[in-house]
Curated annotation (Swiss-Prot):
It catalyses: GMP + ATP = GDP + ADP. This is Guanylate kinase. Keywords: ATP-binding, Cytoplasm, Kinase, Nucleotide-binding, Transferase. It is an enzyme of class 2 (transferase). It comes from Escherichia coli O157:H7.
Amino acid sequence: MAQGTLYIVSAPSGAGKSSLIQALLKTQPLYDTQVSVSHTTRQPRPGEVHGEHYFFVNHDEFKEMISRDAFLEHAEVFGNYYGTSREAIEQVLATGVDVFLDIDWQGAQQIRQKMPHARSIFILPPSKIELDRRLRGRDQDSEEVIAKRMAQAVAEMSHYAEYDYLIVNDDFDTALTDLKTIIRAERLRMSRQKQRHDALISKLLAD
């Protein structure tokens, strides 16, 4: 069976990354494409399901996983830990399913070091003006908060060249098509096609 591909997807806040991934998943069968499920020590929110939204663990369990290098990446956010389990990712990839991981540039660097065969995609907004509009459209944040978000977005965007693919999300449908095209091209790589069609190739080359 052909091994699935791990896709690392990063973008500044407001670039439409989460919306693109969710739209992609709706067009792909579950046996082809899934989104990574992280471990976290925070408490479940109403409606969240263990194993579907997150793997909920306590602090001792999380630290034990850190001690045995069980995470591809992990970080602490507002007193809670979040991490991507190597075992959970590898189990899904072994079934031939592609996995999408929504993560920032720092986490992406950690993962590329441990899984160099992962493919990475960076999503940019079409302009700073449009990014500012999207950030303001989310809620009634103060100018100070918006300025901070914009500064964080610029810092995130400065790492775009570390990625394999670049998508500019100007028109959503076009950006979604670009994302699908990347997946299609990766699935046609020789290494995956050779595994997928091994029996056929053997028959074609037989005397």
